[in-house]
Regions:
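Alpha/beta catalytic cores of nucleotide-metabolism and tRNA/nucleoside-modifying enzymes
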Residues: 1-18, 22, 28, 149, ...
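Glycine-rich, positively charged N-terminal anion/phosphate-binding segment
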Residues: 2-12, 27-101
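Hydrophobic faces of well-ordered beta-strands that scaffold small-molecule active sites
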Residues: 22-25, 49-51, 79-83, 105-107, ...
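Short glycine-/acidic-enriched loop or helix-start segments at secondary-structure transitions
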Residues: 34, 60, 93, 118, ...
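Alpha/beta enzyme core
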Residues: 38-41, 92-123, 127, 131-210
Length: 382
């Protein structure tokens, strides 16, 4: 076993110290309270675990689903919410609501989502192209947040001909943002190809005043340490790498604290985590069957690399109770060891996409006419 040197300095986001400097990326439909609980259990509570995307309009309107999504376990600290919005006024209202009602300790703003339903409204990773709009949103958010730190997560740009991350980073510094996270891909890439870690290094050089976090292609603890070593970034944001692998956060703690401890669970151990995950979802939703149904999306990620036949996978994909799930899992060859090569890419991998944008979006990065509150989404999560 290789012993790794501990990180040289903790990550500081406003008043919060994040050590080791590891952040769970917000993922719609994934990073709800049950999944965050699992990840925190494996990390011993170390790190920062961000909620799935909350739309500012839905929060201000107190949408029922959204109010559930902002629930935090009593032991979660700091409480971290990611907001999505395209209208500065609505974003400001949402942030003030969070502050006045003590709903979170940290606010992250989403400028990285590449999903067409978001970008075609000028939101997510499309928004930083409109520099004045980005500045206005950040100004409103930071002013409304008061002592709560505001951070942003973004991509390199819309495509290779329309890169925005350096301008966006500078605007973030000027408007009082406490840290920036960069996914080293463009919107057009979605999750395809290879993340550009050199861009993360360039951003760190460009905005030395605040922490820069790197995101993209972190599949194991070695990747995280290598990213920090090669880019000089101050921390890492882990997204798809923890799908079906919540114990990755335990590995990350071991790597950054110098123990090098890694988990290689047998299928029996993985099955136990799967059952606990489904149980937590049912408790959180308040309905066992709905919890198990929601868990189905995770099955393939947990079983990646293990020898599980197509018929058994099909059965697991249609389970609707904990008893049924437990019975199906018990029928697997649970003595299988951790498979070689199981730490590779998971989740969506499509790339080279045509980006859905509002008409005329790319004509002028400083023309924000036509972008208004009607572009706000009224639902949160996945």
């Amino acid at each position: 076993m290789t012993t790794l040197a501990p990180a040289s300095a903790p990550l500081r986001i406003g008043p919060h110290t994040v050590q080791p400097p590891v952040v769970l990326a917000p993922m719609a439909g994934i990073t709800n309270a049950p999944f965050r609980t699992l990840c925190r259990e494996f990390s011993g509570g170390k790190g920062l675990f961000v909620s799935e995307m909350i739309t500012t309009r839905a929060l201000v309107e107190r949408n029922e689903k959204t109010m559930q999504l902002i629930h935090f376990d009593a032991s979660e600290t700091p409480r971290s919410i990611q907001l999505y919005g395209v209208d500065p006024v609505t974003v400001g209202k949402a942030v003030r609501m969070i502050v006045e009602e003590d709903l979170a300790d940290h606010i992250d703003l989403n400028f990285g989502c590449p999903v067409p339903k978001v970008t075609r409204k000028g939101g997510g990773s499309a928004l930083p192209y409109k520099r004045p709009l980005l500045r206005a949103i950040l100004r409103e958010a930071v002013a409304a947040a008061g002592d709560l730190p505001v951070t942003i997560k973004m991509r390199k740009g819309i495509d290779d001909d329309h890169l925005t991350y350096l301008d966006a980073g500078r605007i973030a510094v000027e408007e009082g943002v406490k840290a920036v996270a960069l996914h080293g891909r463009t919107t057009a890439q979605h999750y395809g190809g290879t993340a550009d870690w050199d861009a993360i290094a360039r951003l760190k050089e460009h905005v030395p005043e605040i922490p820069v976090l790197g995101n993209g292609d972190i599949w194991n603890a070695d990747d995280a340490r290598r990213m920090m070593r090669e880019t000089g970034c101050d921390g890492v944001v882990v997204g798809r790498g923890c799908l079906g692998r919540p114990w990755l956060f335990g590995d990350l703690v071991g790597a950054f604290e110098g123990t090098g401890a890694r988990q290689a669970p047998s299928l029996r151990e993985v099955a136990a985590v799967m059952l606990r995950h489904a149980t937590l979802l049912g408790e959180w939703i308040g309905d066992e069957s709905r919890g198990v149904i929601d868990f189905r999306k995770h099955v393939a990620w947990y079983l990646k690399g293990f020898a599980v036949g197509s018929e058994m996978r099909r059965k697991l994909a249609v389970t609707s109770s904990l008893d049924e799930l437990g019975t199906q899992l018990a029928g697997l060859d649970l003595d299988q060891p951790w498979p070689d090569g199981a730490d590779g890419p998971r989740g969506r991998t499509s790339g080279n996409n045509r980006v859905a944008l509002p008409d005329g979006w790319l004509k002028d990065p400083y023309d924000c006419a036509g972008v208004g509150a009607d572009a706000e989404l009224d639902t949160s999560g996945g």
